Amino acid sequence: YRFFAKAFLDFLFGPIFFVIISPATAVCAVIVKKHAKKVCEKHWIVGKGGKPVCVRVFSDFSRGDKKSYISGSALKYFPLLLSVISGKMSLVGPSPISLRDGALIDDEYEARFDVRPGIFSSAALAFARRPEYEEMFAADCDYAKKRSLLSDVRAFFTSMLRAMRGEKGEFLCVGGEGYAEELLARGVITAEQLEEAQ
């Protein structure tokens, strides 16, 4: 499963899921196009093997003083399925992190980059709510070593249920503030070190 079947299932189910959500994706694209300058925005994340990978999510926009429903829900991340189809991401895997965050991760967590990042977080099974980053990284490393079809299926449906309940922010963090900002807030790194990690 680790070496072939997982990639095959991503290749098989990625397009199927994209077709299923394509009507909603099209509606979201029209709405975003009307209110934002661009339909999608690019983000660079750390892919398998630590390589930089470019992915796209719907652009953020506001309605009055509030962030739009699309920007604040799992709908924003529907375009990530294209990254699964192209082989950049997996349906289930460690949460995507930015290149800046990746540059600040300790070497002990490097094993999380042995697998492709996932739309649905593999850490969903280990924690009811989003854990501290280091706890999540440790769980990601454990997943990379022990991943199986059963664990992926469980993580998929657990994450899906949480997303339907509006909990997308607990594990999906593409384009949001991340590990670097948290380290700065804790006083672990300085503003200069944050700039160097850009």
Language model segments and positions:
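An acidic site on a long C-lobe helix of protein kinase domains
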Residues: 4-8, 70, 74-77, 148-152
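A hydrophobic, helix-centered structural microdomain
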Residues: 1-62, 155-198
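Cytosol-/stroma-facing membrane-proximal "stalk/adaptor" domains immediately downstream
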Residues: 122-182
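Intrinsically disordered, low-complexity boundary segments flanking structured domains
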Residues: 26-30, 42-46, 78, 106-113, ...
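Short, glycine-rich, amphipathic interfacial segments at transmembrane boundaries or analogous
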Residues: 38-69, 120-138
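Generic anion/oxyanion-binding catalytic loop in active/binding sites
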Residues: 16, 67-70, 142
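A short, structured surface patch at a secondary-structure boundary
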Residues: 57-122, 156-159
